[in-house]
């Protein structure tokens, strides 16, 4: 019996996987890179490497967006939308709540709408909002990051107070 059989099978399999990977990267580069970045979403240095590779391939990386983004990196036309799960200190439950709320009630109209809708689920805190602002995930809500950073605390306090008033008023 030959001991070479298992090795030739292994090498053949590895060759096939390499061929399939190269084929996907060539014919579906945007989808391939989005999937590749999603596979290392918890490793910021690897994500940075792949973002650099995307730039070399002329693939644009769009910023994270609470109105368009998903938890993972996603394809947006011929571009890649940055995954919400790649933002530091944003937990999966928060991302799930954002996506589900958006799918159920439509796009978030402004910062107050966003905070009000997610505060009802008791899943949002000030640090999470701050990290979303810093990452640019709220940029499409009609304001600058500087403006958002200066008003989000007042909005959270206002929404919290309204919540307390509605409980007392019942």
Residues covered by each model-derived region:
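Noncatalytic, beta-rich nucleic-acid-contacting surfaces in large DNA/RNA-processing enzymes
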Residues: 8-170
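Single conserved hydrophobic/aromatic residue that forms the stacking wall/gate
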Residues: 1-9
């Amino acid at each position: 019996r030959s001991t070479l059989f298992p090795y030739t099978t292994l090498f053949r399999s590895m060759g096939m996987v390499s061929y399939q990977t190269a084929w996907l990267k060539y014919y579906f580069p945007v989808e391939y890179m989005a999937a590749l970045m999603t596979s290392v979403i918890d490793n910021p240095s690897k994500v940075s490497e792949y973002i650099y590779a995307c730039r070399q391939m002329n693939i644009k990386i769009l910023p994270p967006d609470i109105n368009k983004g998903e938890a993972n990196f996603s394809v947006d036309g011929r571009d890649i939308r940055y995954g919400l799960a790649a933002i530091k200190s944003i937990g999966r439950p928060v991302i799930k709540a954002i996506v589900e709320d958006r799918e159920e009630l439509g796009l978030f109209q402004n910062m107050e709408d966003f905070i009000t809708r997610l505060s009802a689920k008791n899943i949002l805190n000030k640090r999470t909002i701050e990290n979303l602002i810093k990452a640019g995930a709220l940029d499409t809500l009609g304001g600058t990051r500087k403006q958002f950073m200066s008003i989000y605390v007042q909005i959270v306090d206002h929404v919290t107070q309204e919540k307390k008033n509605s409980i007392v008023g019942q």
